[in-house]
C-alpha cells in the first residue's frame, strides 16, 4: 500500500482537532481538564492504527477499529493524521487510557473497576451463572459476561500484600481485624460472654543464631576488645538508629548459624502445633485430669500471626482463649483461670522441641522456641493490652509481605541468579543461598526449601486460627455480599460455568485503576474523620 499523503509535522498540527478525553479518578492529570470523550467513536487508537491487544492483557477482543475508507474527504484524512500524530506524542500509558475512555462500554468498565475497589491485579473471568427455583425450575436470576466489556468480568485478586495490591490488602486487613476482634469481644455469631474468659496475648520468638546489631541503646558494649574466631570484634559501641541498615545484621556473618536459622523456619509451624498440644496436656495435668479427656472439659482456641524480626527471623504473636468443651458457646470450667493458662504457656514454650531429619552434611538439630517468652492476660477493665489494639496490630501485620519487612521477596526464586539479583541485604541473601543449598540435600527434600527460599524457608501461613476461635474469612465475605444487596435464594439451584481468561491491567487501565483506588481511599478517610468528629461532638454534650 503506498504511503498516505498529507502528513504534517508535530509543529504544524491542527490545534482545532477534537480534544483528548477526561480520565476518571485522576484530578491532577493534564488530560483531566479536557472535554469528555466522544462515545460515538469506537476507534481507541485513531483511524490509522489498528490494535491487537492480547485478551490476557485487557478486556478480550479488540474494540472495533475504524479505518480510512475511500469515502473519506481530504479534511477527514488530515484530521485522522493530525490525531494520530498527537497520540504518538503521548506515552503508551496515556494512549492506552484514551483508548479505554473512548470505548462505548467505558461506563460499564468504570463500574467494574469501582466495584473491585481499584484492584491492582484483577482476575478476568468469562462465563455465566443461572439461579433456578429448586421446585419449578423457573429461572430466578441469570448473568452472562457476553454483555460486558471484552465479554469478561473483573474480580478482586484478594492478595493480602500491600506491595502487590493495596486495595485488596486493605480489605483483607479489615476482615482480619473483625475476625480477631470477634474472638476477643464477641460478635459475628460469637457470644459476647467470651470477653470474661481467660484470654492471653502471647509472644514466642526464635532462638538466637548468633549476635546481631540492635537499635536504641549502645549496641553490644564490652570492656575488653575480644574477637571471634574469625578475627572480628565481638562488641559494638555504636548507638544504631532504627533505620540503620546494620540493625539485625550479624556481628560476624561467619559465626552466624544460617543453617539453623533456615531449618528453624522450615519447622516453625510444626513447633507451634506441638506447643498447642503440650499446653492442653499441661492444663489437664495441672488439675488432675487424664490428658486424653481434656476435650471433655475445656477447649483451647487461638489465632496467631507470624512476623519477621529485624534479624529476618520469624516470631509469633497469638491470642489464646480458654472455652468450655463446645467452644465459644460453653463457659470454661471453674479451674480455668488466666494464671493457670499463663503457667501452662510458659512451661510448654520452654519444653517443646522438634528434631530435624539426620543428614550427613548437617547432622540432627534440636529446634526450640527462644528464651524471650511473653504471656500477658487480657482484661476488660483496661488493665493490660487493649482488645481493639491487639486486633488492629494483628490486622496491620497480615498486609505486610516478606519484601516490605526486608526479610525476603514476595515472589518465588526459581534459580540462583534470582537470589543474586534480589533487592535484599547481604544477610537475607545468605539465608536465601542457604535455603538453596539445603534444598539440594536429599534428607531435606520434603521441606521444599528452594521453593520457599523467597521467605527464607518459612512455609507457614501468616495468620492461622483454631476452628472454634471465631468466624471465618468466607463468612465475612458472604456477609459483605449480602450487605451489598446480592440476592440470596436458600432453596434454589445455581448452575455456574466460568473459566479463567487472564489477569492484570494494561498500562492505561492500571493508571486509571490506581486513581480510582486513591479516590476511594480518600473518601473512606473523609468518612472516618467525619464519624470521629460526630462522636466527639456527641461525647461533649
Model-derived segments and spans:
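Histidine-centered divalent-metal-coordination microenvironment in nucleic-acid enzymes
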Residues: 1, 165, 202, 293-327, ...
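Cys/His-rich microdomains that often coordinate metals
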Residues: 8, 27-30, 169-172
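Intrinsic-disorder-associated, low-complexity terminal segments enriched in Asp/Asn/His/Tyr and depleted
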Residues: 12-14, 28-29, 38, 43, ...
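Short cysteine/histidine-rich zinc-coordinating motifs and their immediately flanking basic loops
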Residues: 13-19, 35-36, 175-184
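Cysteine-rich micro-motifs
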Residues: 16-26, 161-167
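Long, low-complexity, charged/polar intrinsically disordered accessory regions
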Residues: 48, 53-173, 369-541
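Signature for HUH/AEP ssDNA processing cores
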Residues: 169-170, 174, 182-310
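Helical (often loop-to-helix) elements that flank the catalytic cores of nucleotide-handling enzymes
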Residues: 319-361
Amino acid at each position: 500500500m503506498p504511503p498516505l499523503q498529507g502528513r504534517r509535522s508535530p509543529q504544524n498540527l491542527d490545534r482545532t482537532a477534537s480534544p483528548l478525553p477526561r480520565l476518571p479518578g485522576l484530578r491532577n492529570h493534564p488530560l483531566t481538564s479536557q472535554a469528555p470523550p466522544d462515545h460515538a467513536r469506537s476507534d481507541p487508537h485513531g483511524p490509522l492504527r489498528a490494535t491487537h491487544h492480547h485478551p490476557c492483557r485487557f478486556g478480550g477482543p479488540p474494540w472495533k477499529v475504524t479505518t480510512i475508507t475511500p469515502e473519506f474527504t481530504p479534511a477527514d484524512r488530515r484530521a485522522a493524521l493530525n490525531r494520530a500524530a498527537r497520540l504518538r506524542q503521548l506515552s503508551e500509558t496515556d494512549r492506552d487510557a484514551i483508548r479505554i475512555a473512548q470505548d462505548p462500554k467505558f461506563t460499564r468498565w468504570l463500574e467494574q473497576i469501582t466495584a473491585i475497589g481499584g484492584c491492582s491485579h484483577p482476575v478476568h473471568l468469562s462465563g455465566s451463572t443461572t439461579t433456578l427455583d429448586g421446585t419449578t425450575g423457573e429461572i430466578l436470576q441469570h448473568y452472562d459476561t457476553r454483555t460486558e466489556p471484552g465479554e469478561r468480568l473483573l474480580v478482586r485478586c484478594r492478595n493480602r500484600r500491600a506491595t502487590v495490591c493495596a486495595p485488596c490488602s486493605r480489605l483483607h486487613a479489615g476482615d482480619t481485624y473483625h475476625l480477631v476482634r470477634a474472638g476477643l469481644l464477641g460478635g459475628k455469631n460469637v457470644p459476647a460472654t467470651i470477653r470474661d474468659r481467660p484470654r492471653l496475648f502471647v509472644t514466642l520468638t526464635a532462638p538466637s543464631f548468633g549476635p546481631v546489631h540492635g537499635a536504641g541503646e549502645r549496641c553490644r558494649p564490652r570492656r575488653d576488645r575480644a574477637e571471634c574466631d574469625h578475627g572480628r570484634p565481638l562488641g559494638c559501641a555504636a548507638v544504631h538508629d532504627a533505620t540503620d541498615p546494620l540493625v539485625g545484621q550479624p556481628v560476624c556473618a561467619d559465626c552466624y548459624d544460617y543453617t539453623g536459622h533456615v531449618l528453624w523456619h522450615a519447622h516453625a509451624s510444626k513447633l507451634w502445633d506441638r506447643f498447642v498440644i503440650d499446653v492442653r496436656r499441661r492444663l489437664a495435668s495441672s488439675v488432675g485430669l487424664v490428658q486424653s479427656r481434656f476435650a471433655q472439659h475445656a477447649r483451647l482456641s487461638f489465632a496467631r500471626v507470624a512476623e519477621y524480626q529485624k534479624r529476618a527471623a520469624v516470631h509469633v504473636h497469638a491470642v489464646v482463649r480458654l472455652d468450655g468443651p463446645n467452644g465459644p458457646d460453653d463457659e470454661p470450667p471453674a479451674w480455668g483461670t488466666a494464671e493457670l493458662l499463663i503457667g501452662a504457656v510458659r512451661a510448654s514454650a520452654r519444653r517443646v522441641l522438634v528434631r530435624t531429619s539426620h543428614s550427613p552434611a548437617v547432622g540432627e538439630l534440636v529446634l526450640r522456641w527462644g528464651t524471650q517468652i511473653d504471656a500477658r492476660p487480657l482484661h476488660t477493665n483496661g488493665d493490660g493490652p487493649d482488645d481493639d489494639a491487639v486486633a488492629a496490630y494483628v490486622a496491620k501485620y497480615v498486609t505486610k509481605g516478606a519484601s516490605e519487612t526486608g526479610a525476603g521477596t514476595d515472589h518465588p526464586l526459581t534459580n540462583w541468579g534470582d537470589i543474586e539479583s534480589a533487592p535484599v541485604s547481604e544477610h537475607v541473601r545468605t539465608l536465601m543461598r542457604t535455603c538453596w543449598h539445603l534444598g539440594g540435600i536429599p534428607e531435606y527434600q520434603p521441606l521444599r526449601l528452594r521453593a520457599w527460599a523467597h521467605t527464607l524457608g518459612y512455609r507457614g501461613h501468616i495468620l492461622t486460627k483454631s476452628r472454634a476461635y471465631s468466624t471465618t474469612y468466607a463468612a465475612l465475605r458472604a456477609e459483605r455480599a449480602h450487605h451489598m444487596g446480592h440476592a440470596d435464594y436458600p432453596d434454589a439451584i445455581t448452575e455456574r460455568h466460568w473459566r479463567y481468561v487472564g489477569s492484570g491491567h494494561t498500562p492505561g487501565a492500571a493508571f486509571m485503576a490506581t486513581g480510582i483506588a486513591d479516590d476511594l481511599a480518600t473518601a473512606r478517610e473523609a468518612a472516618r474523620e467525619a464519624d470521629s468528629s460526630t462522636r466527639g461532638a456527641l461525647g461533649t454534650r
